[in-house]
């Protein structure tokens, strides 16, 4: 399935584990595309390109996916190289320098036009790559309040949330939010951030 950009707003994004055109990448893709579950040995036999350890989509959440499925993390993989950008990761994947990369779920949609013209791919990006896994939701920026503050009553929190949401409903408000690259807010539940809590707990181990 090809990823496409839409005008729909969302409160989260995801990360993907993406196999490329190398022999190992295609071997892993073939297993997934025929409904077979990848083993840890399968994944550990590949060369991975990842981002820095503080990157949510380029390291933390793919590592959490590995932890939840295999009890392992990116740091346990035998062959890992760090990229300085997602452009570099995609270039390495297209050139067959690495077998697998990790990053935000719309990587292919963003870089597909450059796959052959700049990155060295020999066929269409979507034909030469395959999604091996999709991570938990990575929540976008959030406005939080303290649980320990005396003034944070349920009524105040509701009024504060309403005020923040209303900012995004006017043109003047959107101009203010543009400084943060935000285009609006939605109500959230504490449970929306369970995956983030799991990620933070994993990082402590």
Residue ranges and their predicted role:
Residues 73-91, 137:
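Short helix-initiation/N-cap motifs at beta->coil->alpha
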């Amino acid at each position: 399935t090809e990823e496409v950009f839409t005008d729909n707003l969302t409160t989260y994004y995801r990360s993907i584990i993406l196999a490329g055109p190398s022999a190992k990448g295609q071997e892993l893709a073939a297993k997934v595309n025929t409904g077979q579950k990848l083993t840890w040995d399968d994944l550990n036999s590949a060369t991975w390109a990842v981002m820095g350890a503080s990157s949510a989509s380029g390291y933390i959440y793919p590592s959490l996916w590995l932890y939840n499925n295999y009890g392992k993390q990116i740091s346990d993989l035998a062959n890992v190289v760090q990229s300085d950008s997602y452009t570099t990761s995609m270039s390495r994947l297209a050139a067959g320098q690495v077998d697998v990369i990790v990053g935000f779920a719309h990587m292919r949609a963003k870089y597909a036009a450059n796959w052959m013209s700049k990155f060295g791919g020999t066929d269409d990006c979507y034909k030469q790559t395959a999604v091996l896994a999709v991570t938990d939701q990575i929540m976008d920026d959030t406005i939080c309040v303290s649980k320990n503050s005396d003034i944070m009553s349920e009524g105040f929190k509701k009024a504060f949330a309403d005020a923040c949401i209303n900012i995004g409903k006017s043109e003047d408000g959107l101009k203010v939010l543009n400084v943060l690259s935000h285009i609006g807010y939605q109500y959230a539940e504490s449970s929306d951030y369970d995956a983030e809590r799991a990620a933070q707990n994993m990082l402590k181990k």
